[in-house]
């Protein structure tokens, strides 16, 4: 199987997101790379499903909460930028303050 560098990167993010989901299901708090991977995968898959950029920017901030992350991780991530492929082309999606404290 021959994959382009972009396809390899997407596959790696997807795998990291699977690991993060598995850890969350066991009650393990996420570290920085796992949190980024989970949010990134959410945006990439949402774009593939046909969701809008605005919708993903908004919904991406509710994928995980501060309580699901290791101490200090939410403060480390001010924004996550994802280049995702939408039905009408590739677009940059920015999720500001993606890990919020529970209300």
Curated annotation (Swiss-Prot):
It is found in: Cytoplasm. GO terms for cellular component: cytoplasm. Pfam families: Urease_gamma. It catalyses: urea + 2 H2O + H(+) = hydrogencarbonate + 2 NH4(+). Heterotrimer of UreA (gamma), UreB (beta) and UreC (alpha) subunits. Three heterotrimers associate to form the active enzyme. Belongs to the urease gamma subunit family. This is Urease subunit gamma. It comes from Paracoccus denitrificans (strain Pd 1222). The lineage of its organism: Bacteria, Pseudomonadati, Pseudomonadota, Alphaproteobacteria, Rhodobacterales.
């Amino acid at each position: 199987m021959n994959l382009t560098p972009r396809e390899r990167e997407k596959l790696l993010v997807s795998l990291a997101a699977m690991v993060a989901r598995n850890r969350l299901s066991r009650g393990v708090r996420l570290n920085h790379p796992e949190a980024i991977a989970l949010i990134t995968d959410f945006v990439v898959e949402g774009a593939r499903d046909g969701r809008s950029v605005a919708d993903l920017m908004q919904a991406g901030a509710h994928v995980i909460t501060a309580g699901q992350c290791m101490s200090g991780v939410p403060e480390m991530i001010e924004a996550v930028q994802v280049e995702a492929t939408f039905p009408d082309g590739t677009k940059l999606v920015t999720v500001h303050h993606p890990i919020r404290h529970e209300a």
